[in-house]
Amino acid sequence: MITLAVKVGMIQLCGCSGCHISLLDLHDKLLEVLPNLEIVYAPIIADPKEIPEGIDVFLVEGGIRNEHDEHLIHEIREKSKIVIAWGTCAAYGGIPGLGNLYKKEELLNYVYSTDSTENKGEIPSEEIPPLEEYVKPIKDFIKVDYTIPGCPPTPKMIADAIIALLNGEEPKLPTKIVCDECPRKKENVFPETFKRTHEGRPDPERCLFEQGYTCLGFATRAGCGAKCPSAGVPCRGCFGKTDKSLDLGANAANVLANAGEAALEIPDKVALLNRFTLPDALINRKAK
């Protein structure tokens, strides 16, 4: 264990602050590592005016959505020894990445130019930074040293990464898939039809995918402990692709194709299969 405090920075770009909350969910475990951390930049808990030089580890939550995000990520890289993509939005684009299914102008016009009780029917220009054309993960702009996936990452994964760095080791990610962590019984059969999550009442012991629910545990990196399938909710792929996969959605589609015509019944396939990872997909935006 090192003796000098590590200078740490944290920031939320295009994200929801869920990764920061997951860090707090370490509870007493957080107290074990705090003495070795000097948090020098964290806008979510303080009001710093600028990013200081000489940061050892910078945890970046959120992807790149506007020009201000892009400016910050370059400054963070310049002033930090280690940059960690903290959570799925930073690593793969996350839920905001589904905006890539539309042109920037379409999104702005729908949100701001459609009259409602909440806006004046005009697109703000002075109050907010201009949007980039598409959402992108931070690795598209800078070198990322390590990734902690998840929406949000589990407190254990965050703790393991921090402790590894404090000990001078490299954080390691699970190499298995969610199905390997799932306690449900599998018979290795494909469903004859697919259901929406709210349809029917699944058998609490059988594999959700084999019951016809579009569970993506077979294509998603492990590490969550299969929390969603264990609770009766199909995996949606928030931990992203495995090391052996180039594209979570394409990998999932390839497996689903084995179900034949039943797979054609699945609605909104792009948003389902790349819900958290569209900006990182091989085809990651609306075609011109």
UniProtKB/Swiss-Prot annotation:
Top-rank EC class of the record's enzyme: oxidoreductase
Record key words, sorted: Oxidoreductase
Gene Ontology molecular-function annotations: iron-sulfur cluster binding; oxidoreductase activity
Catalytic activity, EC: 1.12.99.-
InterPro entries (alphabetical): Hydrogenase_assoc-protein (IPR051349), NADH_UbQ_OxRdtase-like_20kDa (IPR006137), NiFe_Hase_small_N_sf (IPR037024)
Subunit text: The F420-non-reducing hydrogenase vhu is composed of four subunits; VhuA, VhuD, VhuG and VhuU.
Similarity comment: Belongs to the [NiFe]/[NiFeSe] hydrogenase small subunit family.
Protein name as it appears in the record: F420-non-reducing hydrogenase vhu subunit G
Species classification: Archaea, Methanobacteriati, Methanobacteriota, Methanomada group, Methanococci
Originating gene: vhuG
